[in-house]
């Protein structure tokens, strides 16, 4: 008999589980100038680690899907979190910016595995408009991560060297892994699948490819802004690291508000139409 879980707690738990990426990126942002000074490199080399993180995160999701479908959401989540914690810890001992790049890639790779399992755990339980609403609620809770992460990062940098950021990320991942092991019931029943055929099915599905392209373009623009915020606010405008979260947080307050708008729109409109008009507005504003 499968263990049941409170609906609200499930949403909170999956939100925290899927927050490994924003925590890994946004907690790190206030430390970028200090890391550049520590390794005596141009700040843009440290910013490049954000792109490397996103590449590792994307590749991790490719491998995370088959792992999730073979061993289940719970095991896949724990494997991802433990790997994320391990490489977050190893970053502390980086002797060069290039070593940091490697560990950041591997940290993100396991982060990608984690997030795939979080998404799959929702898909196992909900479908259609209900799934869209649950994802919006998760998005709303998860949006607190990029809002709070720079605050944590700035506080850590104020009292500790940059390595403290990765001590925090290590502890964060281990705590989440504990609660996933303790409380998240398995929601997947294994059925034998051909991985290559599964990917072929997705890659040849026109609607799926269009959706992925739209998401890639939309989030690509979003992460370009995130990658440069540390330099723009701290280096270019000369804002103190302690105040960085206030300026950075404005973006995510708006994001949370728009997720709430999306939840309300889903009650009366199709997700496809909402995405179409939202993308058009983003293009015009950008």
Task: Indicate where each model-derived feature is located.
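Helix-to-loop junctions at the C-terminal end of transmembrane segments
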Residues: 61-72, 258-272
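Juxtamembrane intracellular "pre-TM" segments in multi-pass secondary transporters
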Residues: 1-4, 185-212
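Residue-level signature of mid-helix packing/kink "hotspots" within the transmembrane helices
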Residues: 26, 54-62, 146-147, 252-256, ...
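Cytoplasmic helix-loop-helix junction between adjacent transmembrane helices
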Residues: 103-142
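Conserved MFS/SLC helix-loop-helix module at the cytosolic interface between two early adjacent transmembrane helices
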Residues: 59-98
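Transmembrane alpha-helices of Major Facilitator/SLC transporters
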Residues: 246-267, 282-285
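Helix-loop-helix hairpin linking two adjacent transmembrane segments in secondary transporters
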Residues: 99, 128, 136-181, 246
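Extracytoplasmic
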Residues: 9-43, 225-230
């Amino acid at each position: 008999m499968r263990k049941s879980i409170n609906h609200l707690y499930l949403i909170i738990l999956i939100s925290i589980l899927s927050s490994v990426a924003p925590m890994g990126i946004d907690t790190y942002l206030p430390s970028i100038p200090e890391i550049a000074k520590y390794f005596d490199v141009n700040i843009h080399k440290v910013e490049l680690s954000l792109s490397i993180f996103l590449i590792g995160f994307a590749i991790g999701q490719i491998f995370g899907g088959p792992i999730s479908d073979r061993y289940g959401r719970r095991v896949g989540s724990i494997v991802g979190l433990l790997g994320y914690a391990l490489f977050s810890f190893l970053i502390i001992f980086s002797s060069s910016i290039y070593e940091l790049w490697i560990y950041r890639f591997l940290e993100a790779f396991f982060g990608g595995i984690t997030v795939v399992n979080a998404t799959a755990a929702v898909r196992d339980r909900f479908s259609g408009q209900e799934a869209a609403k649950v994802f919006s609620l998760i998005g709303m809770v998860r949006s607190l991560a990029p809002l709070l992460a720079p605050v944590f990062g700035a506080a850590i940098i104020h009292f500790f060297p940059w390595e403290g950021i990765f001590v925090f990320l290590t502890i964060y991942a281990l705590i989440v892994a504990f609660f996933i092991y303790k409380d998240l019931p398995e929601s997947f029943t294994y059925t034998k699948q051909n991985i290559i055929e599964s990917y072929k099915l997705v890659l040849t599905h026109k609607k799926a490819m269009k959706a992925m392209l739209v998401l890639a373009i939309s989030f690509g623009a979003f992460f370009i802004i995130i990658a440069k915020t540390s330099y723009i606010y701290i280096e270019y405008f000369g804002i103190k690291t302690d105040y960085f979260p206030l300026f950075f947080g404005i973006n995510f307050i708006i994001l949370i508000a728009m997720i709430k708008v999306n939840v309300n729109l889903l009650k009366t409109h199709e997700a496809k139409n909402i995405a179409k008009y939202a993308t058009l507005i983003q293009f015009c504003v950008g």
